[in-house]
């Protein structure tokens, strides 16, 4: 099953260069990479404004503004000297075929994980996390979820492809343990009986960062963790370019501090999703997503250097 653009076309819209100008590698399974970046240009499961399929391209494009800083502030080292990170381009599927996307993404992830790689993925709408969870659970077993979002995405509407149902489906499939999972920044209606710990945006904005992180670590424990960041967790002042913006969200400063504070968790997979550049202003949403993705890589590099 071919999943990457190099099978027939190296000129993918987002792949003139890799994230942070990192090397492009269209054969990541056989590489010596520690982490592999994959774009998933898919937005058929969105319930709001479409356009998330252009998110991976926007994140890569703006990431050139971050590539010059070797020792990213306030870190004391260059992530690229500790982690071997490559960008393998975008998943290729028949646009309009959600099932094919899901199957190919899961197959791609399973192949990478079996080869000893870890994944950082760029959406695309948030549905792409579900096939990624399926692949990661096959490799790591049941996981904890650390989920930044304005929505819990635990809605049971019966639709197979919906970016609001993944975390209703995932516990039922045994992919994640909601009792060891936490959802951060929520500010929309949700079912309080689904087992997840919800730290809504009001308390996240009002409580101290260290206090929140201590609670997250207590909930997650030593389980393998999948980290997913929906950019609409941020307030629209910091991330207007997304499909379902909700006011009252996190600042970019608070989000970065929280992500940095997850360094000690056993994070086995990560994604940043729901960037829709058609609604962005001066690329601030894409820049926020690229910066958060870079911080995710830095927390992995920090652990490797210990």
From Swiss-Prot:
Its EC number is 3.5.3.11. Catalyzes the formation of putrescine from agmatine. This is Agmatinase. Its cofactor is Mn(2+). It comes from Salmonella dublin (strain CT_02021853). Mn(2+) binds at residues 126, 149, 151, 153, 230, 232. GO terms for molecular function: agmatinase activity; manganese ion binding. NCBIfam families: agmatinase, PRK02190.1. Keywords: Hydrolase, Manganese, Metal-binding, Polyamine biosynthesis, Putrescine biosynthesis, Spermidine biosynthesis. CDD domains: Agmatinase_PAH (cd11592). Belongs to the arginase family. Agmatinase subfamily. Disulfide bonds: none annotated. It is an enzyme of class 3 (hydrolase). HAMAP family: SpeB. PROSITE patterns: ARGINASE_1 (PS01053), ARGINASE_2 (PS51409). Coiled coil: none annotated. It catalyses: agmatine + H2O = urea + putrescine. Pathway: Amine and polyamine biosynthesis; putrescine biosynthesis via agmatine pathway; putrescine from agmatine: step 1/1. GO terms for biological process: putrescine biosynthetic process from arginine, via agmatine; spermidine biosynthetic process.
């Amino acid at each position: 099953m071919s999943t990457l653009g190099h099978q027939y076309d190296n000129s993918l819209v987002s792949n003139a260069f890799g994230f942070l100008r990192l090397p492009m590698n269209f054969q990541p399974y056989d590489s010596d990479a520690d982490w592999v970046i994959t774009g998933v240009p898919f937005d058929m499961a969105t319930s709001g404004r479409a356009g998330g399929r252009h998110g991976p391209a926007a994140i890569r494009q703006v990431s050139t503004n971050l590539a010059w800083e070797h020792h990213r502030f306030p870190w004391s080292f260059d992530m690229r000297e500790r982690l071997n990170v490559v960008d393998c381009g975008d998943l290729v599927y028949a646009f309009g075929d959600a099932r094919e996307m899901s199957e190919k993404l899961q197959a791609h992830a399973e192949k990478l994980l079996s080869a000893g790689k870890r994944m950082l993925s760029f959406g695309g709408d948030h549905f792409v996390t579900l096939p990624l969870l399926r692949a990661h659970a096959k490799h790591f077993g049941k996981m904890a979820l650390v989920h930044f979002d304005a929505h819990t995405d635990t809605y049971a509407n019966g639709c197979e492809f919906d970016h609001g149902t993944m975390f209703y489906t995932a516990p039922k499939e045994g992919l994640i343990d909601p009792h060891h999972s936490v959802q951060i920044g929520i500010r929309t209606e949700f079912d309080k009986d689904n087992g997840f710990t919800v730290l809504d945006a009001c308390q996240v904005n009002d409580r101290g960062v260290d206090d929140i992180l201590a609670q997250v670590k207590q909930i997650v424990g030593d389980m393998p963790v999948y980290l997913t960041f929906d950019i609409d967790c941020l307030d629209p002042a910091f991330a207007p370019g997304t499909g379902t913006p909700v006011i009252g969200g996190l600042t970019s400063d608070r989000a970065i501090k929280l992500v940095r504070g997850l360094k000690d968790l056993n994070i086995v997979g990560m994604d940043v999703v729901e960037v829709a550049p058609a609604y962005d202003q001066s690329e601030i949403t894409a820049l926020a997503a690229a910066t958060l993705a870079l911080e995710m890589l830095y927390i992995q590099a920090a652990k490797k250097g210990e």
